[in-house]
Amino acid sequence: CELRFHPGCDQAYIEETASSISNALDTVKGDHPGSFSLFSNFESNSSFDEYQRAFTDIKMRIDCGDCYQVNLTQSFTAKGDGEPLAAYLRLRRATTAPFSAYLNWNSGALLSLSPERFLGLVDKAVLTQPIKGTRPRGSTKEADIQLAKDLLASEKDRAENLMIVDLLRNDLGRVCQIGSIEVKQLFSVESFSNVHHMVSDVSGTLKADRDALDLLTSCYPGGSITGAPKLSAMAII
C-alpha cells in the first residue's frame, strides 16, 4: 500500500492525514470487523418498462448518429444493518478486484471494488486501461477457455473497446506530450474470479507543466462508464 499526495499539499495536512490513517489502521488491526446483513432485497431505480424505453431511445439516437456508444446503467438499493467494513471484506472474499477501496465517514461509507485502472501516474508516465467486453467464467476448464476465446473474437466487443481507446487517446492528448501517446496493448483478455474482461492499455507522458489534477480533469469521467463521444453520451444519459 502506498500513500501519495499532490505536490501542492501543505506539509501539515500531509502529516495529519497520514497520522489519521495510521491511527485508524491501528484501531481495526486484529479486531473482528463485526457483521453486516441485508434485510431487504435489492431494488432498481427504474422499472423494466422504463429501462426498455431508455434502451430503445438510445438505440434510435445511435442510429441517427448522435453518438456511437452509450453506457446505460441502473442503480440498485437495499436496506442493511451492521459494520460496513464487514460488508466490504465479504465482497473482497467473493470477487477479485485489483482496484478496491473502503472509505468511511460519519455520514456513510464507500465500498468500491473495480477491475479497471482508470488512470495511473508514476512520475510523468501515464497509463489508462479501459475495459469493454465481458463474459462469465465457465463451469469447466474447457468452457472457460471457450468463453475467453469468444470474447477475444467478438467484433461487437472489439468495436466498443476501440471506441473507448480512441476516446482516451483524445483525453490524454490534451495533457500529454505530443507524440508520446501509444496503445501498448489492444484487445487483451484478463480473467478475474467471476468474469473475463477485454482490456486495452493506453500510455503517454504528461507535459512538464501539467500535474495529476490536470490529468484527472482532462479524463474524468472515464469513457468506459459514459460512452462515446463522451459529451454526447453524457447528455443522452
PLM regions with names:
Residues C1-I237:
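Extended alpha-helical targeting/anchoring segments
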